[in-house]
Amino acid sequence: MGESETARIIFRILVRVTQEHYDVVVLGAGPGGYVSAIRAAQLGKKVAVIEKQYWGGVCLNVGCIPSKALLKNAEVAHTFNHEAKAFGISGDVSFDFGVAHKRSRKVSEGIVKGVHYLMKKNKITEINGLGSFKDAKTIEITEGDDKGKTVTFENCIIATGSVVRSLPGVEIGGNIVSYEEQILKDEAPKSMVIVGAGAIGMEFAYVLANYGVDVTIVEFMDRVLPNEDKDVSKEIAKQYKKLGVKLLTLSLIHI
């Protein structure tokens, strides 16, 4: 064995002693990342997961879980507002969007706690921050609570998910929000223009309309929910119009 090879081996040993070394490092704690980490740990690997913000991913924190909780509240509000007589309900009822929002966060946080429990149960190291590759076997944490930490690994799984795609010339901020900002707001606006009549846009429209918000949906295609069957689009458009939602199809926006 040559001196250069011996030096490389010594260097690797020193790195493992002075830094945290793992069989598997997972970038991203969404459903792809944390499930992969659990499986690797079950197979006997030493595993770490690096996550900069949302343990459990977008779905659990600011996506399908809190949105479905809000939809349930909106469904209850709709029943009182539009179907009370059919259920034998009478009297004045008020609806507090802030309470609905608080419930949605509680539901979300409860499930996220479950993700942390699974990490602990499977002896997976949690690292909070943004991971950046220093080389093919090293990641440095450049942001977050564990900023400055360096880890080395034998294998890395990249499960970083995606980011919101904005419209050309549009910057998120102020009264222009993405789904993420909106789902974290604890107050309902007086009015809202929703660009896009896909599933996310239609869900927000239903929630807000049932809490008295003046909602307008702008859609480039010729119908709402354009990826669904035409019969579905037709029926849901009819129901939304009954709610007072304005639907503008075959339309563009200019800001």
Placement of each model-derived feature along the sequence:
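Beta1/beta-strand and adjacent pyrophosphate-binding region of the FAD-binding site
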Residues: 18-30, 190-195
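Glycine-rich flavin
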Residues: 20-22, 38-45, 50-188, 216, ...
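N-terminal Rossmann-like FAD-binding beta1-loop-alpha1 element of flavoenzymes
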Residues: 24-48, 204-209
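Conserved phosphate-binding and hydrolysis motifs of nucleotide-dependent enzymes
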Residues: 28-33, 161, 196-201
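Rossmann-like NAD(P)H-binding beta-loop-alpha module
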Residues: 187-220, 227-228
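Conserved small/polar residues in nucleotide/adenosyl-binding loops
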Residues: 253-255
